[in-house]
Amino acid sequence: MERNSVKFHAEKRSGAFDPGSGFGSSKRVKTHHTQLLSALVVPVGHAAFRLLCPLSHVGAVIGKSGNVIKQLQQSTGAKIRVEEPPSGSPDRVITIIAQADSKSRVKLGANNNGNAEGEKKEEEVEVSKAQGALIKVFELLAAEADSDTVVCRLLTESSHAGAVIGKGGQMVGSIRKETGCKISIRIENLPICADTDDEMVEVEGNAIAVKKALVSISRCLQNCQSIDKVRMVGNRPLEKEFQASLHRPIETIIQESLPRSVEVNPYDYRLRNDEIFPRGTVARANDVIPHDTLHLRRIEAVPQGALRMHIEADRQDVLRRHVEADRQDALRRRIDVVPQETLYMPSDVLRGDCFRQHRERDDSHDSLHRPFEMVPRDAMGMPFESFPRDAYGRPIETMTQETLRGQSADYLAHRYSTLDTHPHSFTTSASMANTATMKPPPSEVEVGNQDVVFKILCSTENAGGVIGTGGKVVRMLHSETGAFINVGNTLDDCEERLIAVTASENPECQSSPAQKAIMLIFSRLFELATNKILDNGPRSSITARLVVPTSQIGCVLGKGGVIVSEMRKTTGAAIQILKVEQNPKCISENDQVVQITGEFPNVREAIFHITSRLRDSVFSNSMKNSLAKSSSALTTERFYDRQSDNPLSIGSHQSVSNPATNSSSLHRRSEDSFLSGSHSSVNYSRSVGTDPYIRPEDPFPDRFNPSAGYSHNFGRRFTMDHSDNSHHLTEAPSRLWASPPPAAPRGLSDASGGLSSARAGHVLGSGHKSAIVTNTTVEIRVPANAMSFVYGEQGYNLEQLRQISGARVIIHEPPLGTSDRIIVISGTPDQTQAAQNLLHAFILTGETSLSKKYNLN
């Protein structure tokens, strides 16, 4: 077999180019049998196809002394090469390169030796020279088949497979219908001769049908190739040799430039790939050095042959920081180095929203080997610096707490002020004599960015519509939202594919990239489903299937199903949590399916509610871990004196009637109301020690820091109680969150932040007393650019909001200095909650409609 294999090169032995073939001579060059062939060059205006051929059939393509393959090249004007197979591979790759714009005609028969019946079915079609050569090679392979059913396998890049699938699978479906062939695109279990980024198009049927399908498939693949520039196909031995060299210790180049070796310890700064060498020194992309090669080992250089020039730059150019530079040069980097032992020491210096002590070191070289933490940054990537710094990074002056409070009031009033009105609150009891000072609670930046992941199922036939031609739709979704979208592989006996949306988010971000992406994907799936059922008439309902980790199902279900029941009532959609046994094969056994059925607006609103709860759950878990570490460093503030028995209300008023006394609680606004960004709160009294509405196994309720009486969402409610059972916030969590009495009723909120649906009002406990919430007033701050979605056309949305919820909705003019509008919603808790949900839905629907200006087709 090896004796008959043919290797082609782009030049003759004399070095002259053969104009007759268009690609050079086909004479064989003697090489070692283990040496791989060099990569083939695809000239401008040419297309390339890769056809898989079993080892047993290679001889039919090559022929004796290469006669067959030579005749094919001469008759088609194509470059045809049989690649060397990897060790143990049962297949070989046949690479075909020819002109894409030149036309030729081929006969679609069984083969050149077809019988009379086959000749009757022959038809002639016009194809390019590249397609014609592909058909000719396939005819040789089909002649070697032992049965009437033949299989053709094409290798293609992952980005080109979408062209074969088409929008919503329409292209591959039409080819199947026209030819009667079985066509599948495989991502897994590929032969070892395929590249890592390849997919395989497999066509099965009789010879005539497969050739017809091959014409259509090759046309799709040819149209998406970049024929206007030179490309490389085939084996890449230089790249493989280069990647293998990364695992060998190469220290000569870097040591010639550096007087001493540079060590990277596990706590120090791990350089990114593009920060290791000066720009323009590496011949390939920046991914030539994997991250793991920089961890716990000497910094290694790439082989000198892979560099365009010898690295003779100084240390600052090579490593982007001067190892032995003075302090001022070291501070030119974007990230400050702070000793770890100073990060958690109490201080009056505020760095961002965190209390830290910035201790100066005289030895800048020693700081390179100390643990450090990145400077907190906001959603726009800007550092949280609230004071000027000199050239050495030292604060020029320290802010007093009074100054901090005044500035934070304006800063916090704008953060999380948009549509942040879910009524979560927590009550504390203060000692009535002390008036201490409350330091601002630890910022969410200390929690760090969290990966927010949402998953949704889609049918296999609609997956192509989400991916788009060459991944166009996925790239646009990423560009629009910033989230990463991954469409899972197709599995046997599974009619669905899993779409995972991932985004790194911070609790301070006012919008969720992952949530926006999942809503756009759902709208896209609805559009695809609608286009396919136009012939069957309108459809009254649609089903969406979200995939939720089993560990997070509780925040969707709620205690006794109270949360999911409330969402069903609010959205009007049927929400069902399926058992693990009903999971499709494409999802893990650690996940469960949340199935939502209803009309499109209702299902979309339900998805918004569910993903909002899942996102809050991610950050609340992180906040709990952070608060457990930092609670000892915080102090609390007593808000009212010993004689006051009135609860504290910030931003909103809620009437509470006590069945025993039939009297209303008094309200007053705190001078520290900046803790509530949207100025909306739910005010009611209860004793923390005997609170029957918080599960004892969950010591920190959702969105609350018991150490500072602070909610991680600035727009949440902040209340104090006036119970006689006073306690101090410095007590252990086990005392603050005692087990509830066995007969205690279920109240307004649970640990997941859900709402009960009591018809007669919400029963609230305060020690041995009870109170019923009869009326709630909530203020919501809405940006001016979103008000058009609230009003709707000719005020239709606003009118619907009032009629459906039954709440009283008043829109106030914007205050001085801001364009945000204040929407006041009042009514029973059920009415206000329904109005808030509808308000969220209207704004989200408007934002989604604006996204249609992006061509997602």
From Swiss-Prot:
Basic and acidic residues composition-biased segments: 1-15, 718-730
InterPro entries: KH_dom, KH_dom_type_1, KH_dom_type_1_sf
Any single GO BP term: mRNA processing
Keyword presence, Cell wall biogenesis/degradation: no
GO MF assignments: RNA binding
GO cellular component: nuclear speck
Predominant place of localization: nucleus
PROSITE patterns: KH_TYPE_1
Pfam annotation, one family: KH_1
Biased composition (Low complexity): 746-755
Disruption outcome: Floral organ defects such as reproductive-to-perianth organ transformation and loss of floral determinacy.
Biased composition (Polar residues): 645-665, 673-688
The keyword Plastid belongs to this UniProt entry's keyword annotation: no
SUPFAM superfamilies for the chain: Eukaryotic type KH-domain (KH-domain type I)
UniProt keyword terms in alphabetical order: Developmental protein, Differentiation, Flowering, mRNA processing, Nucleus, Repeat, RNA-binding
Region (Disordered): 1-27, 644-755
Described purpose of this protein according to its UniProt entry: Functions in floral reproductive organ identity in the third whorl and floral determinacy specification by specifically promoting the processing of AGAMOUS (AG) pre-mRNA. Functions in association with HUA1 and HUA2.
Subunit and interaction comment: Interacts with HUA1. Interacts with FLK and PEP.
Protein name: KH domain-containing protein HEN4
Originating organism: Arabidopsis thaliana (Mouse-ear cress)
Lineage of the species this protein comes from: Eukaryota, Viridiplantae, Streptophyta, Embryophyta, Tracheophyta
